[in-house]
Amino acid sequence: MNDPASPQPTALPTNVLKGFLLAAAGLLLFACMDSTTKYLTAHYNVPTVVAMRYIVHCLLMLVILAPRHSNKLITTQRTGLVILRAAVLTMASLFIGLALQRMPLAETTAINFLAPTLIALFAGSLLGEQIGGLGWAAVITGFIGVLLIARPGSGLDAWGIVFALGAAVANAAYQVLSRLLASTERAITLLFYTALIGTIVFGLALPWFWENKTPSTPEIILFIGMGTFGGLGHYLFTLAYRYAPASVLAPMTYLQLLWAGLLGWIIFDSTPDTWGITGMVIIAASGLLIALKSRLNKH
């Protein structure tokens, strides 16, 4: 799961379909990134895979955006919070990689999508927002969904579940920080710092985790593709907000669950059981309740 940049002003109705399609493509690329991560973690340790993702992402931004936006990439109003936000995302990336190494793609993605529900809890204490009855209903519903997916007898790895929950908590904190910074920071700056801090953190750790083997040509292509999927996915989702309002795009993020299910079936021959699918639907419903609560609060 990934956090899009701050939404742009409300779009014209004629452009909503374009925004919808851009968001759908971005979410597909996020699912492709997770699929590639899962495949590579079967052959390399997780820190190495995550490091390569951030290195490719950072290089792409430097090559494509730095010549035109050099000052905008690095200039911030609240540098400490920007770096903290990026560091939290590196934790989420590590946790999701460890979870994908141990669990099927769809189930990992579903548990990670508990993040929007957790935001309701974080926002209450950090942003002073009222949770309310609908918010608490969403929180409880989301945890019921996780319990159905991770129930005894599900066959899922216990540590994989722990790491997926850790990723959800980190993602929620990351998104709350994004909201705190939205009023003062440019989307392109926040995106660059996530790539830069991830590259620094995992790049420095890489000598301790690097495995003494040379990647094959297909693996090199996958490493490059993984970073490209993430960077391009963020770009398309950010672009979608120019054409469609947040009220349309926010519920759409759950389309990534569908993409994850399809790719998990096509690539890894893995399909969730009936209880797992039920849990995924319930988690999606909890997130939609949060979106509804947010919309009602604005009116």
What are these regions (language model features)?
Residues 2-4, 19, 43-91, 170-173, ...:
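Transmembrane alpha-helices of multi-pass small-molecule transport proteins
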